[in-house]
């Protein structure tokens, strides 16, 4: 008898069919919110911080380039991360290596950056430090840290423009809701923009949060004021 387990059943039909072919039909489900109620997982709150941007773009890639390269925005985001890190270890997930590098340059010795180019042992050494650290910031690409790592002592999870993929968003939050001896709650920070495509993607994510029973609030921030 073989059991197939997954924490995230895809919503897109083609992704679901690939999973169905590998594992077979779904025979039972237990949601993260149920595990939170049972005390197995840490409770969470999603803080959506929507940076006010007045730039307009005709396609998503041009918009992303602006969101990840505008120096003033990056200064603001780095400042937010440093502030929330005062409450405990922080994991920051980014989509692009360039964005991770820019944030790292703004945080100095308070942060480390890991990506696919970082050797596996070096990545693991940084992850292991979280077990005893009190104010460590790990900046990582979604590709290396969104799944498959165990970091229970993350008290703040920052998602920088996480997009509209159900699997990516929910699996990323899964990095933060693992419990530790000194942790039963995690703050999730969804950093996004008022730009056209980012706003559409946020609408999708808010639907994901509602479905998962993750409480959330939205705050707009004029970073250029």
State each model region's role.
Residues 91, 101-102, 108-146, 168:
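Conserved helicase ATPase core of P-loop NTP-dependent helicases/translocases
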Residues 7-12, 34-41, 50-54, 98, ...:
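Conserved nucleotide-binding/hydrolysis micro-motifs of P-loop NTPases
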Residues 55-106:
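Conserved interdomain hinge at the start of the Helicase C-terminal
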Residues 1-46, 209:
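Post-DEXD/H (motif II) to motif III coupling segment of the RecA-like Helicase ATP-binding lobe
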Residues 139-140, 147-162, 168-171, 186-190:
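A short beta-strand element within the Helicase C-terminal
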Residues 179, 195-225:
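Helicase-associated low-complexity regulatory tails and linkers flanking the ATPase motor
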Residues 8-9, 164-188, 205-207:
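Conserved SF2 helicase motif VI
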Residues 86-89, 135, 154:
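Short, high-confidence coil segments that cap the C-terminus of an alpha-helix
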């Amino acid at each position: 008898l073989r059991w197939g387990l997954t924490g995230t059943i895809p919503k897109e039909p083609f992704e679901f069919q690939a999973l169905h072919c590998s594992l077979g039909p779904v025979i039972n489900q237990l949601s993260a919110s149920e595990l939170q109620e049972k005390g197995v997982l840490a409770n969470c709150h999603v803080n959506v911080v929507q940076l006010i941007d007045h730039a307009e773009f005709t396609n998503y890639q041009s918009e992303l380039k602006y969101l990840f390269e505008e120096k003033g925005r990056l200064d603001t985001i780095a400042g937010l991360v440093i502030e929330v890190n005062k409450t405990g270890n922080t994991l920051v997930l980014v989509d692009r290596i360039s964005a991770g590098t820019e944030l790292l340059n703004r945080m100095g010795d308070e942060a480390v950056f890991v990506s696919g180019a970082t050797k596996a042992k070096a990545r693991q050494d940084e992850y292991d430090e979280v077990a005893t650290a009190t104010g460590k910031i790990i900046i990582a690409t979604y590709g290396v840290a969104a799944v498959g790592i165990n970091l229970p002592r993350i008290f703040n999870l920052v998602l920088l423009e996480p997009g509209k993929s159900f699997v990516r968003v929910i699996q990323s939050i899964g990095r933060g809701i693992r419990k530790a001896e000194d942790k039963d709650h995690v703050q999730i920070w969804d950093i996004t923009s008022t730009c056209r495509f980012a706003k559409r993607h946020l609408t999708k994510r808010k639907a994901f949060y509602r479905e998962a029973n993750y409480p959330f609030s939205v705050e707009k921030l004029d970073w250029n004021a």
